[in-house]
Amino acid sequence: MGKDVTEFTYEGKKYTPQSFLEMTKLNLNDYVTITSFTHVPFYKSFILDIPDNFSYGNFYNMPLDEFVQNIDNALDNGYTVALDADVSESTFSGKNGVAVIPASAEDKKTILSEIKPELKVTPEFRQQEFENFNTTDDHLMHIVGKVKDQKGNFYYKVKNSWGSESGQNVSNGGFVYMSVPYVRLKAISVLVNKKALAPKTKKSLGV
């Protein structure tokens, strides 16, 4: 990975990693990482065994519906959300600017260009796909809003890092429109401001 970065320039000013953090005025204690799995108790923190969690960070576990509801609650209240997700599915496409989970194998051929029914993702199926390594922690992105298609289906507007120009083989200015079923199945976790959590979740977690 190379040498540690000790100094860099941002908008014409030099920073160290520490001075840049101070400039942002972010208090890292204001944030929590939430997730949803069935192999650990709900509303407890635990260390998730994934390669990217090399620092042994804690995750708060909760039911799948509540996990998604907290993403919505954050966005509806003006907060954005950091996302850790699996992007290895053939139906995650930066080129097409969408990430979806088709209800049938046949629809995989056309779902990137046509609106098709999507899979009903249960907690049990999510857990199964994680345990058999079909879901892995591939990529970090940034959920900044929601959009709706012609049939009224909601998608999360996800800022990706694969470029923003059409010549870079991306669509939607580099954003990916990620369906709710995709998030239910393939979102490993999200980092969210404590103030953006739903009141019930705050109480259950004691934060």
Predicted regions and their residues:
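Active-site signature of cysteine proteases
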Residues: 1-207
